[in-house]
Structures are given as C-alpha cells and as structure tokens.
C-alpha cells in the first residue's frame, strides 16, 4: 500500500461522514479529540477531519492540526486498511505541540487497530455447506 493521501483516501461527502457518526464500529478517545471508525469494505482506509472554530479558534492552528493528522494517517494507514475514520477535535487540541501530537496519534492509531472487531466465522467460510447444517 502506498503512503499517499490521494482523493480516494478521503471522506468527501456528508453521506460518508454521517455513516461513520451514525454507526461507528470503533471509538478511541484521546487527549482533546475523539476518533470514530467504521468498516468501509474497501482495501484502503479513508480519513475525515472535523475541527470546528469553537474547538480550535485560530485558523493557523486548525490548519496545522489538519496537516499533522493527515501526515500521521498517511504514515500509519497500513494498520487501518478497510476503515472509514473521522477525527473530531475538542477544545485545547490547538495548544499541544507538534512532537507530542505525533506521538499521541501513533498511540491512537495502534489502539484503533487493536480495537477492531475480528471477523466472525460464518458457516460458509468454515467450509460447512449451509444446506447440510
């Protein structure tokens, strides 16, 4: 998997965001943020960012946070294949320094990857014919 952040790896429409908000399969709370995730059925992850003016006042800080989040996602996307991910910023996130944020995101991605539900074994995947069962 390449480490790019192309258009196909972004949540672009309100419908995509709504799907993650309405039924997340994984939640990882962090320091001043929340990560929501949902299986997307694709072979690559997609990222959406929600950083409101109420949470982070200055545009410079919002843009810095978005840049750091995208970069961290890009470097860790092999852990996150098949997920739609939304990061919701909360108050105080803009005051955290860059190295601390990078370290924090590294831990959060690993926690999210560990919290993924393991695929359930179905009758068909176990080699049992459903008509005989």
Curated annotation (Swiss-Prot):
Alphabetical UniProt keywords: Endonuclease, Hydrolase, Nuclease, RNA-binding, tRNA processing
The main enzyme category here is hydrolase
An example of a Gene Ontology cellular component annotation for this protein is: ribonuclease P complex
Q: What sections of the sequence does the record tag as coiled-coil? A: none
Summarize the subunit comment.
Consists of a catalytic RNA component (M1 or rnpB) and a protein subunit.
Tell me which family the UniProt entry assigns to this protein. Belongs to the RnpA family.
Q: Which PANTHER family does the UniProt record give? A: RIBONUCLEASE P PROTEIN COMPONENT
Q: What is this protein called?
A: Ribonuclease P protein component
Record the organism. Pseudomonas putida (strain ATCC 47054 / DSM 6125 / CFBP 8728 / NCIMB 11950 / KT2440)
């Amino acid at each position: 998997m390449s480490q790019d952040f192309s258009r196909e790896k972004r949540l672009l429409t309100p419908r995509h965001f709504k799907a993650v908000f309405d039924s997340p399969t994984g939640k990882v709370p962090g320091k001043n943020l929340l990560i929501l995730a949902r299986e997307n059925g694709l072979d690559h992850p997609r990222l959406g960012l929600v950083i409101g003016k109420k949470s982070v006042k200055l545009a410079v800080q919002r843009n810095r946070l978005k840049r750091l989040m995208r970069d961290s996602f890009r470097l860790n996307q092999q852990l996150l294949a098949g997920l739609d991910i939304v990061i919701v910023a909360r108050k105080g996130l803009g005051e955290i320094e860059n190295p601390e944020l990078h370290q924090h995101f590294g831990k959060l991605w690993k926690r999210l990857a560990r919290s993924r539900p393991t695929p359930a074994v179905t009758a068909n995947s176990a080699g049992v014919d459903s008509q005989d069962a």
